Amino acid sequence: MRLKIKKSGSFKYSKKYLDLIAKTKVYDVAEKTPISFAGNLSSKLKNEVYLKREDMQPIFSFKIRGAYNKIANLTPQQQKRGVLTASAGNHAQGVANACKKLKIPCLIVMPVTTPEIKVKSVRRFGSKVLLHGDNFDQASKKAIQMAKERKLEFIEAFDDPMTIAGQGTVGKAVSYT
């Protein structure tokens, strides 16, 4: 699903995004996390600061929300073929976790400079990893090329309505607290 949104230099909020956020499937995999008062930070900034504890998610990041929502909303045919993405960190783990949960084949292209702990974390979820390029842009270019050649769905880390809607559930959760 692609939403047509005019690009005008600033992000335009849309009722369509709010509708997508309301219909997300993220709680099939994401945990409901608390909001905690940050005493030390509040003192330092002379203001009340609260933290949404997304570090308590299975991958220690909110990125699981967007990745899972996008992948869970693929067609059965797309899911059967598998997915591909590029990332050097939390998005890769979110995609790998979602694919394990949904039993979908997954290949993640990561720069050769990715810390070994991140690579191991992705492999722990059962995803295949290809190390390519010295930076994210090179890895991403390779992943997009491979997705086209193999007719796999490329899972965007941020520039996709379903990914944005999944990640937007953080705001929804904060508003209900």
Language-model features, listed with the residues they occupy:
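PLP-dependent amino-acid enzyme catalytic core
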Residues: M1-Y176
